[in-house]
């Protein structure tokens, strides 16, 4: 949650954390699905990709390398949807550098 907030990504829903069945209608509004634990939720994320074309990030942000890769994948997914000109797009490499040095 913290990394998503820090890089400016708004979380649509966290399933099943405090969600209700009625909120499932909002799932297709997400730009991508983030599945930090492949054993929980990956099948659903694959289904949403097949049905709604919603890509999935399943890199577990644990350790320096995978945390950096996960953030880069988020940046790439958000960048594909961003309407800002390329010169205004956000570069998260300084954030990645700062947080992987302090681990």
Swiss-Prot record:
Coiled coil: none annotated. Keywords: 4Fe-4S, ATP-binding, Chlorophyll biosynthesis, Chloroplast, Iron, Iron-sulfur, Metal-binding, Nucleotide-binding, Oxidoreductase, Photosynthesis, Plastid. Gene3D superfamilies: Nitrogenase molybdenum iron protein domain. GO terms for biological process: light-independent chlorophyll biosynthetic process; photosynthesis. It holds the Pfam family Oxidored_nitro. Its main location: plastid. Residues 86-103 have a biased composition (Basic and acidic residues). One of its GO terms (cellular component) is chloroplast. The keyword 4Fe-4S applies. Its cofactor is [4Fe-4S] cluster. Protochlorophyllide reductase is composed of three subunits; ChlL, ChlN and ChlB. Forms a heterotetramer of two ChlB and two ChlN subunits. This is Light-independent protochlorophyllide reductase subunit B. It comes from Selaginella mollis.
């Amino acid at each position: 949650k913290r990394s998503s907030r820090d890089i400016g990504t708004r979380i649509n829903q966290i399933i099943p954390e405090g969600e209700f069945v009625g909120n499932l209608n909002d799932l297709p509004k997400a730009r991508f699905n983030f599945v930090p634990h492949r054993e929980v939720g990956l099948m659903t994320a694959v289904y949403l990709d097949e049905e709604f074309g919603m890509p999935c990030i399943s890199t577990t942000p644990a350790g320096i390398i995978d945390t950096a890769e996960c953030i880069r994948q988020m940046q790439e997914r958000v960048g594909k949807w961003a309407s800002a000109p390329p010169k205004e797009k956000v570069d998260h490499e300084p954030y990645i550098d700062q947080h992987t040095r302090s681990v």
